[in-house]
Structure formats: structure tokens, C-alpha cells
A protein has these predicted regions:
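A contiguous strand-loop segment
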Residues: 1-2, 36-39
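Short, structured surface segments that line ligand/substrate-binding pockets
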Residues: 46, 52-58
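Alpha/propeptide regions of enzymes that mature by internal proteolysis
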Residues: 8-33
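Short, glycine/acidic-rich hinge or "gate" loops at secondary-structure transitions
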Residues: 40-46
């Protein structure tokens, strides 16, 4: 719906001028009150760069908004961070791969007579 369309560069201004909290932003974006429309770039034609946006309010609450599958997806952002592609939820899952990292050597683990040493 072009009547709800904003360029990727205009989207942050719309957020800042229309809403007072991340809850208001969430409701508007999830209801489809806005869509990101392609911008014509010389030599590229109409494109909508997959910008990712971070939104904070005065309470410290934060959201990430990113294009996924042609729609804007909203994520709660407890870490207060922003990522590029792949999607924010992928990065949150990937972060769990590093939770158990430790700067100290891990002692070998013995299981049924076999000893397993940590890599690295």
C-alpha cells in the first residue's frame, strides 16, 4: 500500500515524530501502519536497502525493527544492540553458542575410560 509507504531513510524520522514510546512504535509497525518502499537509485533501479533500526524510549526500553520476508519485524531488545543481516533472532540464537566460553583452561573430561580435552 503506497499510501503507507516511506523510504528507508524517512522511516527513522517518522518514528521520532509520531511516537513517544517503544510500545507505540511496536503497535504501529506490527499493525502495518507503515511499509518501507523502494527508492530509485541511479544504476540500481528501485531498491529498498534492508536497513535495520534500533529504537529506544525514555524508560530505556528498546526494539529492533528489520525487514524479514518483505515485512517489518519487531524484536524486543533487552541487550540494547543492533545487528545487520542475518536477522536479529538468528544473532540472539548464535550468541548462545558463546555463553559457556571461559578464559581459563578447562580440565579434560573422562567418560567411560575416554578422555576428552577441550579444543584451543
Amino acid at each position: 500500500n503506497q499510501s503507507k509507504g516511506l523510504s528507508p531513510a524517512d522511516f527513522p524520522n517518522w518514528l521520532l515524530t509520531q511516537f513517544g514510546s517503544v510500545d507505540e512504535v511496536r503497535k504501529a509497525v506490527e499493525s502495518g501502519a507503515v511499509v518501507i518502499t523502494p527508492t530509485v537509485l541511479d544504476g540500481w533501479g528501485p531498491v529498498a536497502p534492508p536497513f535495520h533500526y534500533i529504537v529506544y524510549d525514555k524508560t530505556g526500553a528498546s526494539l529492533v525493527i528489520e525487514p524479514v520476508g518483505g515485512k517489518l519485524k519487531v524484536h524486543d531488545n533487552a541487550l540494547g544492540t543492533l545487528t545487520n543481516s542475518p536477522s536479529f533472532d538468528w544473532h540472539m540464537t548464535n550468541l548462545r553458542n558463546y555463553i559457556a566460553l571461559n578464559p581459563r583452561d578447562v580440565p579434560p573430561l573422562k567418560i567411560d575410560g575416554d578422555t576428552f580435552k577441550a579444543l584451543g
